[in-house]
Each structure stands twice: as structure tokens, then as C-alpha cells.
Amino acid sequence: MNPLVIKLGGVLLESDDAMKRLFEALVDYQKFYKRHVSVIHGGGRLIDNLMNKLSLPVKKKNGLRITPSEHINIITGALAGTANKTLLAWALKYNINAIGLCLADGGSVDVERLDENLGHVGKAIPGSPLFLKKLFKEGTIPIISSIGITKDGLLMNVNADLAATALATTLQANLILLSDISSILDGKGQRITEIDSIQAEKLIMQGIITNGMIVKVRAALEAARVLRRPVDIASWQNTEKLKLLFNGVNIGTRVYV
């Protein structure tokens, strides 16, 4: 079975209940299945809250956070520090053998500057799977923040959905984009069980898919195209359904090319 990359987002990183459900599902899943799992995360809300406390502006362009040089150390501390180690602490609480990493560790995901106008915002490029495969053999779950480092040593903030796509490509893994959003919704607020690129772009043009969800959907479409397999967008809210999701059952929206 292909490895599984689980991207975490939304309120999950700030909710003890969400963490509990996620790690209970992971523990139960690993009792019955020997699939290699890697977790990757952002932390947008955590960063927003921190920036507000520091009275620093939060600006985004096309769903991507503008990250000037004076902000990158703060964002790195929030993502590679607080968010990553909080997830690691939960894993250890549930006796899961895990390690906290960033995209650059082991050359797993390479990063280039995406756009000078966005500042320290990186483009994620698939890297080498060797380090992560070694961890898998040792029974370790990598928990990876979406902070990357360029070849010339610059820290970069990478959109976590796009980072997850690059990581899944590196590992030739199945990808789940997990958040508080249970699925893509149509114009009537109903769940869309399956969607392809034509349908997705139509909903974007109609203003039904907006803001950060545009980035998420396009990241899923790109991942589906590169990986040549569908990508799931789903919610963490039901532990039993999570276990089904980890085993390939569609509980949210399945994205096809």
C-alpha cells in the first residue's frame, strides 16, 4: 500500500478535542494496518493570532500569506516551533513514535522563492524520499511543518497545502487534506462527493469556492495530476470515519484531475 500523507489545518491545531480524535484514530488505525504515515501541517490561525498580539499586519494575496523579512522569524517560530512541537507532544502522549521536522530536513522537500512581491513565501518542489523512508522503516511518523529553506539558506513560509502536495509527490503517497471543513460544498451548501478540474474551476468562477479554499482545491488538483491518483479533502470531526478515510474510503470530497 502506498504511504499516506495527512495534511492538518483549520482549527485542528488549536482544539484539544480535534487532537484527541485525530491521534485516537491514528492509534487505532496502526493497530490493524501497517501503512507508512506522514503528517504535515501549517498553522495559519496560530500565526494570525500571534501577529495580532504583536500588532503586526496580516496580508494575503490569492490565499497566500505575504511574509516580509521582518516576519519570517516569527512565523518560523510559530510553525516549526509551537505548532510542530504541540503535535509532537500529542503524538508522544498517545505513545506514537514520532519526530518533528521541517521541509528541509533530509532534503525531503526543496524550496525556492515563489514571488519577490510575497517576500519569504516559498514554492515547494519534491525532494528526496530517502530520509523519510528510513524513518518509516524504524516505525517513526514524521510530523513536518511547512517551513522550508532555500539552497542559499533563506527561511521560507510555504502554503501547507502546496507543501503537502510536494511531500506526497516525494513519497509517491496518497494525500488527505484534513481540516474543519468536511467537504467542498455546492451553491446550495450540499456536499460534493467528487469533483474534477473542470467542475472546480466553474465553482471558482461562480464565486462558490473562494479565498483559501481556492488554494486548497488547486493544490489537490495539482497533487491528483502529479500523483495520478485522487486526493481527499475531509474533516477530522468523526474518529470512526477518520479510520475509514485513512484506509481509502471517501468521507468528504474526492478530487480528480
Swiss-Prot record:
Pfam families hit by this protein: AA_kinase
EC numbers, comma separated: 2.7.2.8
Binding site for substrate: 43-44, 65, 157
Annotated GO MF terms: acetylglutamate kinase activity; ATP binding
Residues flagged as site, Transition state stabilizer: 7, 216
Superkingdom, taxonomy of origin: Bacteria
Ligand binding (ATP): 180-185, 208-210
Top EC class of this enzyme: transferase
Main location: cytoplasm
Pathway: Amino-acid biosynthesis; L-arginine biosynthesis; N(2)-acetyl-L-ornithine from L-glutamate: step 2/4
Record keywords: Amino-acid biosynthesis, Arginine biosynthesis, ATP-binding, Cytoplasm, Kinase, Nucleotide-binding, Transferase
Reaction(s) catalysed (UniProt annotation): N-acetyl-L-glutamate + ATP = N-acetyl-L-glutamyl 5-phosphate + ADP
Subcellular location: Cytoplasm
Biological processes per GO annotation: arginine biosynthetic process via ornithine; L-arginine biosynthetic process
SUPFAM superfamilies assigned to the protein according to its UniProt record, in alphabetical order: Carbamate kinase-like
One cellular component (GO) term of this entry: cytoplasm
Record's subunit section: Homodimer.
HAMAP family the record matches: ArgB (MF_00082)
Functional summary from the UniProt entry: Catalyzes the ATP-dependent phosphorylation of N-acetyl-L-glutamate.
Family that this chain belongs to: Belongs to the acetylglutamate kinase family. ArgB subfamily.
Name of the protein in its database record: Acetylglutamate kinase
The organism's taxonomic lineage, starting at the top: Bacteria, Pseudomonadati, Pseudomonadota, Gammaproteobacteria, Enterobacterales
